[in-house]
């Protein structure tokens, strides 16, 4: 097979909230158009009576990703939540063509989103650009497996199949899940546990704290405990179901912690 250059179309930028449950798949923000990573190494450079001393210092890595906005997209929402709340986010640059080990070459880092820009022209889609500053430096490695809809997204989210190989719709056309129903809660003096019915087709659930809808956790179960609340305090909790198609509309419940026990 003749050697070919790495094509930009094959390189995908994946993200994951630091609150995502262990074992969760990475998120591929929709409609990516451009991406880049860059690194700069500081050099120790001094002149001495014995001549010039030159040596390597620390490395500062950064990244930029541009994409068109999509309502309800889970990957884009994870980025926005990390930016709004000043949280770290996990970040991968992945070559989606398998290497000689039958795996995917990748770079990984924890990062902060330094800037986010919306371009809202009269014509065309809304363009969103983000810049990231990596904590430490990017780590090189290999990803064992990736969801088919990420690998084959440029082909419509799927590759050739044999008759009867799978069931369901094309991976790239997964409909949004329904909103969680029948939210209930139990309370202590400093926490509330919210429960809801399972949503068909949901891979996980985002739980948001307060009126500002700050992401508290991404969970794969149908309950979550929110802690660190003052006694006798109301707290609005929103829950949304998530799958490969994006995030569902939110369902809301107003909770209240128990009063503090009297010490008199």
Curated annotation (Swiss-Prot):
Post-translational modification: The tail tube is formed by the proteins gp17.1 and gp17.1* at a ratio of about 3:1.
Organism encoding this protein: Bacillus phage SPP1
Keyword list, A-Z: Viral genome ejection through host cell envelope, Viral long flexible tail ejection system, Viral penetration into host cytoplasm, Viral tail protein, Viral tail tube protein, Virion, Virus entry into host cell
Gene name per UniProt: 17.1
Protein name: Tail tube protein gp17.1*
Keyword Ribonucleoprotein attached: no
Subunit structure: Homohexamer. Self-assembles into a long sixfold helical tube. SPP1 virion tails are composed of about 40 stacked rings, and each tail ring is rotated by about 21 degrees relative to the previous one. Interacts with the tail completion protein gp17.
Protein function: Forms the 160 nm long, sixfold helical, rigid tail tube. Binding to the entry receptor triggers structural rearrangements of the tail tube leading to ejection of the phage DNA into the host.
GO BP: any one term: symbiont genome ejection through host cell envelope, long flexible tail mechanism
The keyword Nucleotide-binding is annotated on this UniProt entry: no
Cellular localisation: Virion
Matches recorded under InterPro entries: FN3_dom, FN3_sf, Ig-like_fold, Phgtail_TP901_1
Domain called Fibronectin type-III: residue spans: 179-261
GO cellular component: virus tail, tube
């Amino acid at each position: 097979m003749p050697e070919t250059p790495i094509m930009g179309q094959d390189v995908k930028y994946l993200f994951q909230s630091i609150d995502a449950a262990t074992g969760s798949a990475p998120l591929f923000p929709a409609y990516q158009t451009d991406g880049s990573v860059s690194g700069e190494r500081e050099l120790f450079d001094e002149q001495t009576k014995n001549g010039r001393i030159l040596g390597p210092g620390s490395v500062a890595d950064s990244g930029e990703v541009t994409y068109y906005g999509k309502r309800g997209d889970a990957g884009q929402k994870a980025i926005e939540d990390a930016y709004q709340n000043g949280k770290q986010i996990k970040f991968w640059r992945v070559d989606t063509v398998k290497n000689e080990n039958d795996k995917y070459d990748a770079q990984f880092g924890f990062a902060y989103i330094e800037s986010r820009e919306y371009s809202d022209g009269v014509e065309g889609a809304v363009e969103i650009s983000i810049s990231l500053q990596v904590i430490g430096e990017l780590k090189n490695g290999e990803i064992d497996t990736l969801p088919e809809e990420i690998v084959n997204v440029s082909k419509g989210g799927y590759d050739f199949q044999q008759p009867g190989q799978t069931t369901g719709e094309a991976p790239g056309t997964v409909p949004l899940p329904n909103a969680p129903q029948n939210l209930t809660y139990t309370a202590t003096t400093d926490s509330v546990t919210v429960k809801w019915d399972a949503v068909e087709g949901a891979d996980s659930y985002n739980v948001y704290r307060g009126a500002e809808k700050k992401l508290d956790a991404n969970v794969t179960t149908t309950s979550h405990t929110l802690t660190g609340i003052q006694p006798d305090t109301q707290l609005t909790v929103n829950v949304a179901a998530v799958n490969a198609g994006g995030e569902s509309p939110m369902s809301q419940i107003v909770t209240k912690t128990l009063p503090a026990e009297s010490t008199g």
